[in-house]
UniProtKB/Swiss-Prot annotation:
Similarity section: Belongs to the phenylalanyl-tRNA synthetase beta subunit family. Type 1 subfamily.
Transmembrane stretches, start-end: none
Superkingdom of the organism of origin: Bacteria
UniProt domain B5: residue ranges: 408-483
GO cellular component terms, A-Z: phenylalanine-tRNA ligase complex
Organism annotation: Staphylococcus saprophyticus subsp. saprophyticus (strain ATCC 15305 / DSM 20229 / NCIMB 8711 / NCTC 7292 / S-41)
UniProt-listed GO biological process terms: phenylalanyl-tRNA aminoacylation
Name of this protein: Phenylalanine--tRNA ligase beta subunit
Length: 800
C-alpha cells in the first residue's frame, strides 16, 4: 500500500518529516518498507508557457519553442515531443537544473539552434512509465489548468511529496485505505481526523425508478446497493486527483473511472461503475454463476465461470464478476452518459477462490478477500456521487436501492483497567486508557473499573480484550513502557530444576544404553491416534488439518517411533534403537482444556551388540528392553514392579505393565506379530512411561548402609508350573515369605520342551539370603526356605 504524505495531510494535520512519521508508524506495528521521494535529484523544475512554436530549419522532428518560465524574457527551447504546441502549459527543466538519473540541464546547440532548457515528460521527472496517462505516454505533459509561469513544477504537479510504502500483515486491512491510515496517524499524534465531503445535491429523479436490485444468495452477498448519476461528462480528471492516483500506483483513465479508483484508495471500499445504457435492463440481479457460463471481462478475455463464482447480471446475462472485474460491454467509455454505482459486501472466501482460479488479482479483490468495513460501504458510494457531481457534472438521483443487511458497524468489548495494567506491566489510569481509544476513533463508556469499547468494523483485527490491550500499548508507545526487572515467585541461583536435572540424567542413561533421541510430530492420522494408549480417552482432532496423516493429536509416542524404525529398516539399517521424550494429549470435553502429559518411550530392534573378537552378538529381546526400564528406575531412585498384561498392538504373551507404588505408569513388551509383519520388522520391543508421574514421586535421601560383615547363602530352585503362569508371580510369592533374610530372588532360566508337558514350563530362580547382624545358620535358612517352597506348592508349583 502506497501512502502519499500530501494526501494523508488532507485528513490529518501533522507537521512532521516523512522519515520521522515512517519511524513512528513502524514502531506501532505497521512496517514502512520504503519511502519514495519525488523531489529527490530534482532541481530548477518550473512551470512554463509555450508562447510560440516554429519548425526547426534543419530537423523535421524538432521544434523551436519560445517559453515563458517567469523570467524577464522567454527562453528558447528546442523540443522533439510530437505533442508540443503553442498555448500549452508545460513542465520545464531550466538551465542548471537536475532530473532523476543524474541528468544535468545545460545550454546546448541542437542542429545549429540554441536551447536553454528542456520541456519534460512525466517519465523524465520520475513518474513510472506504466502510470503515465495514455495521452502523455509518448510525449510531454500538458497541464489542463492555467498555472502561473515560473511556479515550482513539483508543487503544481503535487509531486513535492514523499510516499510511504507499507508492508502490511493480513490482519491490518484497515491500513489498505487512506482513511484507515489517517485514523492510525491521528491516534499517534493525538490530533483530529477530518473525513472527506460526501453530501451531494440530489435531483428529483428517484433511484428506484432507474434501477432495482435483487440478491439470490445472501450468504454469499450479505449486502448490495446501487445509486445512479446521470448526465456525466467524460473528461480527464483534475490534476490533483490524477497525481494522487499515480502516487498510489494507479494509472489515470478518465474522470469517472478515476473517481471509482480514488474512492477505492480513500475508503478501502471497492466500487464498480456501470454504463447504465449498456446494462441491458433496469434490473440488477446478483447470483452464483451457472455451470459453464461465459463472459468477456474488461481485459477482453473470455472467462469460463464456475458455480461457486458470484456474478452481477442484468437479470439474464452476467455483466461483472463480483469483486473481481467488470464485463466489457457495460464498462464506462467516452460515450457514457449515465452511471450506476455499485457498493456491496461479498463473501471473502468466494472472491479469493474466484480471483485465484482466474488469475485476476486486483486492488478490489485484495480488499474483498480481507473483508471490508461495513461502516464505509454506503459512505463510499455517497463520496463517489459527490465527486461525480463536482468533477464530471453529473446529476445525482435521490436515494439508493439495496437489499440485504450491512450488519453491525461496531462490536462492543468490555475490558477492565486492572486487566490492562496487569498485562502491560505498569499503571495507566482509566482516563489515559479512554483517551487512547478516543484517539483511535473508538467510542467508549465507563462503569467503575470497566470500559465498554465500541470497536468499528474497519478494525477486523480486534475481537477480544487482549487485542484492545495491544492497541493501548501500540498507541501509548512500546518505547515509552518503563523497563523493569522480572518478578519471580521463586528465585533460584541459576541451577537446573529437579525436573530438568532428572530429564538430563535419563537422556544420558538412554544414550549410554545405545539409544538415539528421536523428535516426531505431535500429530498422527486419526486411525492410529489411540494405538498403544494406556487409558481410554477421547482424541483431539484438528478442524482444518493440512493432511489426513497429521489430523489428530497423539495419545502415545509409539506410532511415530515405529514409523522411524520402519524407515530405517527399509534402508538396510536393521539395528535401530530410539527413544523420545514428548507430549501426548487427552481431550476433556468441549468446555475444558485438554490434558498435556509428557511421556518417555523407546523402541529397539535387531542386534543389541555385534560380533566382536571379545564377545558374541546379542539380539534384542524382552529382557534387554526391561533392563533399560529398570535402569531408568535406578537412576530416579525408584522401584518398578511388573505385571503381565495385554495392550492393543503388543504381543499378548510378551507384555508387562510397569507399576509404581501400585499404579500403572507404563508398559514394556514386544510388538504384535501382525504389526511387525505390516511394517516388515523383525522382533521389535517397545516401552512407554508416564514421565510426569515419575517426576511427581518424591525421592528421599540415599541412606548409608555398611558393607555386610557376614557371608550370605544362595539356593537355586527349579519349579514346574503352567505355561500361563508369569515368573513375576512366583518372585512375588518368594518375597512375601522370605522374611528379613531374603535379599534377592532372580529368575535365571526358563525351559520349555523335551521332558516337559505341553502346557508346562520350568523356571529356575536363585534366592540370596543374608543376615546383617550375625552369621546365617543352616537351620535358619532352611526354615525360611521351606516356608517359601510350601507357599509355592500351594500355588500349584512343583519342585523339580
Amino acid at each position: 500500500m502506497f501512502i502519499s504524505k500530501e494526501w494523508l495531510e488532507s485528513y490529518v494535520e501533522i507537521n512532521e518529516q516523512v522519515n520521522v512519521l515512517a519511524e513512528r508508524i513502524t514502531r506501532t506495528g505497521i512496517e514502512v518498507d520504503d519511502i519514495i521521494d519525488y523531489t529527490k535529484e530534482i532541481k530548477n523544475l518550473v512551470v512554463g508557457y509555450v508562447q510560440s512554436i516554429a519548425a526547426h530549419p534543419d530537423a523535421d522532428k524538432l521544434n523551436i519553442c519560445q517559453v515563458d518560465i517567469g523570467e524577464a524574457e522567454p527562453v528558447q527551447i528546442v523540443c522533439g515531443a510530437p505533442n508540443v504546441d503553442a498555448g500549452q502549459t508545460v513542465i520545464v527543466a531550466s538551465v542548471g537544473g537536475r532530473l532523476p538519473g543524474g541528468v544535468k540541464i545545460k545550454r546546448a546547440k541542437l542542429r545549429g539552434e540554441h536551447s536553454e532548457g528542456m520541456i519534460c515528460s512525466l517519465q523524465e521527472v520520475g513518474v513510472p512509465s506504466n502510470l503515465v496517462p495514455k495521452q502523455f505516454e509518448d510525449g510531454i505533459f500538458v497541464f489542463s489548468t492555467e498555472v502561473k509561469p515560473g511556479t515550482d513544477a513539483l508543487d503544481a504537479l503535487y509531486l513535492n511529496d514523499q510516499v510511504m510504502e507499507f508492508d502490511l500483515t493480513p490482519n491490518r486491512a484497515d491500513a489498505l485505505s487512506m482513511i484507515g491510515t489517517a485514523y492510525e496517524t491521528a491516534a499517534l499524534y493525538n490530533v483530529p481526523m477530518t473525513k472527506p465531503e460526501t453530501q451531494s445535491t440530489e435531483t428529483s429523479d428517484q433511484t428506484n425508478d432507474e434501477i432495482s436490485v435483487n440478491i439470490q444468495n445472501e450468504d454469499k452477498v450479505p449486502y448490495y446497493s446501487a445509486r445512479v448519476v446521470k448526465n456525466v461528462t467524460i473528461a480527464p480528471s483534475p490534476e490533483w486527483m490524477q497525481m494522487r492516483l499515480i502516487k498510489a500506483g494507479i494509472r489515470p483513465i478518465n474522470n469517472v473511472v478515476d473517481i471509482s479508483n480514488y474512492v477505492l484508495i480513500e475508503y478501502g471500499q471497492p466500487l464498480h461503475m456501470f454504463d447504465q445504457d449498456q446494462i441491458g435492463s433496469k434490473h440488477i440481479e446478483v447470483r452464483q454463476a451457472k455451470a459453464d457460463e461465459e463472459m468477456t471481462t474488461l481485459d477482453n478475455q473470455e472467462r469460463q465461470l464456475k458455480e461457486n463464482d458470484i456474478v452481477i447480471t442484468n437479470g439474464e446475462t452476467p455483466i461483472a464478476i463480483a469483486g473481481v472485474m467488470g464485463g466489457d460491454f457495460s464498462e464506462v467509455t467516452e460515450a457514457t452518459k449515465h452511471v450506476v454505482i455499485e457498493g456491496a459486501i461479498f463473501d471473502p472466501v468466494s472472491i479469493r477462490h474466484t480471483s485465484r482460479r482466474l488469475n485476476l488479482r486486483s486492488e478490489a479483490s485484495s480488499r474483498f478477500e480481507k473483508g471490508i468495513a461495513t461502516e464505509f460501504v454506503d459512505e463510499a458510494v455517497d463520496r463517489a456521487c459527490y465527486l461525480l457531481q463536482t468533477y464530471a457534472g453529473g446529476s445525482v438521483a435521490q436515494g439508493r436501492v439495496s437489499q440485504g443487511e450491512l450488519g453491525c458497524f461496531v462490536t462492543p468489548i468490555d475490558i477492565s483497567v486492572s486487566k490492562v495494567n496487569q498485562t502491560i506491566g505498569f499503571e495507566l489510569s482509566a482516563e489515559d486508557i479512554e483517551s487512547i481509544f478516543v484517539q483511535l476513533g473508538f467510542e467508549t463508556t465507563k462503569n467503575k473499573d470497566v470500559l465498554t469499547v465500541m470497536v468499528p468494523s474497519r478494525r477486523k483485527d480486534i475481537s477480544i480484550k487482549e487485542d484492545l490491550i495491544e492497541e493501548i500499548a501500540r498507541i501509548y508507545g512500546y518505547d515509552k513502557i518503563p523497563s523493569t526487572l522480572p518478578v519471580f515467585d521463586q528465585v533460584t541461583h541459576g541451577a537446573l530444576t529437579d525436573r530438568q536435572s532428572k530429564s538430563r540424567i535419563i537422556k544420558a542413561t538412554l544414550e549410554g544404553a545405545g539409544l538415539n533421541q528421536a523428535i516426531n510430530y505431535s500429530l498422527v492420522d486419526k486411525d492410529r491416534a489411540k494405538d498403544f494408549a494406556l487409558q481410554e480417552r477421547e482424541t483431539i482432532d484438528l478442524l482444518m488439518p493440512m493432511s489426513e496423516a497429521h489430523s489428530t493429536l497423539r495419545q502415545s509416542l509409539i506410532p511415530h517411533l515405529i514409523d522411524a524404525v520402519a524407515y530405517n529398516v527399509a534402508r538396510k539399517n536393521s539395528d535401530v534403537r530410539l527413544y523420545e521424550l514428548g507430549s501426548v494429549f487427552f481431550a476433556n470435553g468441549e468446555d475444558e482444556l485438554p490434558d498435556e502429559v509428557e511421556y518417555l518411550s523407546g523402541i529397539l530392534t535387531g542386534d543389541y551388540t555385534v560380533n566382536h573378537w571379545q564377545s558374541k552378538k546379542e539380539t534384542i529381546d524382552f529382557f534387554v528392553a526391561k533392563g533399560i526400564v529398570d535402569r531408568i528406575a535406578e537412576k530416579l531412585d525408584i522401584q518398578f514392579e511388573y505385571e503381565a498384561g495385554e495392550i492393543n498392538g503388543l504381543h499378548p504373551g510378551r507384555t508387562a505393565y510397569v507399576e509404581l507404588n501400585g499404579e500403572i505408569v507404563g508398559f514394556v513388551g514386544e510388538l504384535h506379530p501382525k504389526t511387525e509383519k505390516d511394517y516388515d520388522l523383525k522382533r521389535t520391543y517397545v516401552f512407554e512411561l508416564n514421565f510426569d508421574k515419575l517426576m511427581s514421586v518424591s525421592v528421599g535421601y540415599i541412606n548409608y548402609q555398611a558393607i555386610p560383615r557376614f557371608p550370605g547363602v544362595s539356593r537355586d530352585i527349579a519349579l514346574v508350573v503352567n505355561r500361563a503362569t508369569p515368573s513375576a508371580k512366583l518372585v512375588n510369592i518368594i518375597h512375601e515369605h522370605g522374611g528379613n533374610i531374603l535379599q534377592e530372588a532372580e529368575v535365571f532360566d526358563v525351559y520349555e520342551g523335551e521332558h516337559m508337558a505341553e502346557d508346562e514350563k520350568s523356571i529356575a530362580i536363585r534366592l540370596a539370603y543374608l543376615d546383617t547382624e550375625q552369621t546365617l545358620t543352616d537351620d535358619k535358612v532352611n526354615a525360611v526356605h521351606e516356608a517359601i517352597l510350601e507357599a509355592l506348592k500351594s500355588e500349584g508349583a512343583t519342585i523339580r
